[in-house]
Amino acid sequence: MQDATYFTQPVLTWQRRYEALRAFFVDRLPTQLVAERFGFSAGYVRLLCHQFRHGTIDLSESLQQDKPGRHKVSSDTRGKIIAWRQHRLSAGQIVELLSEEGVELSVRTVERVLAEEGLPRLPRRTRLKVGLTVRGMQVPERSQSLATIDQLEGQRLESTGAGVFLFAPFITQLGLHEVVQAAGLPGTKIIAATNYFLSFLALKLLGTERYAHVGEHAFDPTLGLFAGLNVLPKCTALSTYSYSLDEIHLTRLQQAFVQRSSRLGLYDGKTINLDFHTVPHYGDQSVLEEHWAGARGRVMKGALTLFAQDAQSKLLLYTAADIHKEEADDQVLTFLSFWKRVRRGVRPTLIFDSKFTTYRNLSKLNQQGVKFITLRRRGHKLMAELEKVSSWKRITIANEKRKYQNPLVFESQVPLREYDGEVRQIIMRGNGREKPAFIITNDQEAPVDLLVGTYARRWRVENGIAEAVKFFHLNALSSPILIKVHFDIIMTMIADTLYSRLAQNLRGFEACDAPKLYRDFIKGKGELGVKEGRISLTYPRRAHNPILRAVPWQRLPQKIPWLNDAPITFHFQ
């Protein structure tokens, strides 16, 4: 039997709303008192009043007595919910996946289904564990070695970095995995030394400017597979690894690589160009010394580096980075010691500019039977003696592209300060320069036109350095730690060699530099597939695909040793 409590203490939600509004508008009770009497919050009472004034509230009696029926979930949807929970996805993530498939369910419905299936709630997790950053961005997987490529069996992966696999046969040919082992590079429990090395190499081959930009490839399993990983290591891991290397590791790595390349006949080794390059550093607290930066025409803080280039093949074959001012003059002797370990019995002709070393070191080179061609520094005394020269001889430099092919020369034997004996001096004018050049050499037998032409081609090493700066971002110095700088330069040398090896197999593009090869052949999308343990790369139709099709891939290594000797094939549409 109903009494007054039916009106003063309503139970049903619709009636509580009605009595609350009546008490506020008719009985003029304050908001807080109405809220306490009918079990609402003060804010909810104000919301009811707002909805009542605007006619947006329904005060009719609910037919289901405030007990709405539960959303029915099909067995198919229920199975998907269970499967996704087994992958440790939250109810909210499951709702998003269902929404993508056109199934609209609430989070509470998903939680009810999970409870009915006896699946416990997930413990509270941080955003990082969930796989999201503070800004809601997805967190990539942790990099780790692939035990076998069978983990990718049957998958088809599209990547903008698939072009790096074109270097895989040449990497195998150079035996870089064996070079890493010979150098004794360190690894970690999760990532081996070879995998780290190939990760750095992949970034170099793609022209990546800094380690921080590796995030562009954080979700690319194709590049990860190239390095024998699920994905490439993150920026912190790469930077930390480069700091773990010491000079002994780098010396072994460089020597093992150059010895391997030399055995393959990549270097002529008869003439070698040498040059310094200052890698600028702009850090506020830089501890690096100041060196002359020729490209900028001024002295600035930076890392002084050395490059040695085979004059015939134009390949870099030696680098150094940990060079102080007082050590710069003796670098020619340090290089010679390295070259004797690599190519015993071969004495090259060294080409360098006037400021590369001292006359005393030139004397030491002469005593060891090493020929050199360099410039003599012009002074007032030399320029005054030039006026006495009258018997000039015109020669022809065998270079069809050279603008000034017929300069005038004058030969003589001259002594040098701190040099035992005399050197052959060739004064050259009419070569497009305002002032004449004074070439000095200890080669007494070579024809003068050959000596002049050989020195004139020293610009090749400058072009090589310019290419390293432009494409391999040599000047993107992110650390004053010179060990890290030297490692980056060695990786530049290796990447440059691989681009050269690719160019030698591209008909009509043999003389092209790395930027052009990357633009025409490497850059762009490709699809990688793994089937029955075989790796296949498919590249979409591009203008230069016929050139790639003509490469004799069958004569190059067909298996990738660091991927369990998995066979690899290329398809160009």
Question: PLM features: what roles do these ranges have?
Answer:
Residues 142-156, 363, 368-463, 468-470, ...:
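An anionic, glycine-rich sequence signature occurring as long contiguous blocks
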Residues 214, 447-482, 487, 491, ...:
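Short amphipathic alpha-helical "interface-anchor" segments enriched in bulky aromatics
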Residues 1-17, 64-76, 185-192:
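Short, Lys/Arg-enriched anionic-surface-contact patches
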